[in-house]
Curated annotation (Swiss-Prot):
Active site: S120, K159
Organismal lineage: Bacteria, Thermotogati, Deinococcota, Deinococci, Deinococcales
Domain of life: Bacteria
Site (Cleavage): A84, G85
Keyword Amino-acid biosynthesis: no
Pfam families: HTH_20, Peptidase_S24
Protein name as annotated: LexA repressor
Subunit-level organization: Homodimer.
Keywords: Autocatalytic cleavage, DNA damage, DNA repair, DNA replication, DNA-binding, Hydrolase, Repressor, SOS response, Transcription, Transcription regulation
MF annotations from Gene Ontology: DNA-binding transcription repressor activity; sequence-specific DNA binding; serine-type endopeptidase activity
Record field: catalytic activity: Hydrolysis of Ala-|-Gly bond in repressor LexA
One annotated GO biological process: DNA replication
Length: 210
């Protein structure tokens, strides 16, 4: 917890979140159990520190910032960029905060995660044990990475999909894995891959060679 975020200030932010949109300083003071004078002082400090939005009006509702959500464990700090080529000095102060992991990944309603088993998609950085973000869709465009159900498999598979006449070709991103072809009516598309969450140690990637 940041040193300036004392237990009292943390309680104020948590109470503001609990009370929701429209929460006033008076309501938060009552929720936390402090005086109106004390809440006024703490609110001013929290605004200066960037944990509460600036006041639109003197008695307007309190609004927590993304920085506050991150400090309360509801978001992740973004510490700038890191170089993959020439070494760069790591930044010590966060330049921004993401309000949640959903916002960081750009998730939409209905999106879900699947854990990957196997190494057929390592060429695009999807490793065994990683998670892929899937956006439900009954169809995908040629070349998109899709989650599909195929004949003889009880589980869905992750492959790059192409249409060829009445057939569907499913290709891996690993030259050691064979391509698969099925009649289009036997393939059921569950959705398209829109993101990846890597959770394992770095490994060697493979790329498809034509």
């Amino acid at each position: 917890m940041p040193p300036e975020l004392t237990p009292t200030r943390r309680s104020i932010l948590q109470a503001t979140l609990r009370l929701g949109a429209g929460a006033t300083a008076g309501q938060v003071a009552q929720e936390v159990g402090i005086t109106k004078q004390a809440i006024s002082q703490q609110v001013n400090i929290l605004r200066k520190l960037g944990y509460l939005q600036p006041a639109e009006t003197r008695y307007g509702p309190l609004q927590v910032t993304d920085r506050a959500r991150a400090a309360l464990g509801e978001g992740l700090p973004i510490y700038g960029q890191i170089a993959a080529g020439i070494p760069a000095l790591a930044e010590q102060s966060p330049e921004d905060f993401t309000p949640s992991i959903e916002a960081l990944l750009g998730l939409k309603a209905g999106d879900f995660l699947l854990r990957v088993r196997g190494e057929s998609m390592t060429g695009i950085g999807v490793m065994d044990g990683d998670y892929v973000v899937v956006r439900p869709a009954p169809e995908v465009h040629d070349g998109e990475v899709a989650v599909v159900l195929v004949p003889g498999d009880n589980a869905a598979t992750l492959k790059r999909l192409y249409h060829f006449g009445q057939d569907i070709l499913l290709t891996s991103e690993n030259p050691a894995m064979p391509r698969l072809s099925f009649p289009a009516e036997q393939v059921q598309v569950q959705g398209r891959m829109v993101g990846r969450v890597g959770v394992g140690a770095p490994r060697v990637s493979h790329r498809v060679t034509e």
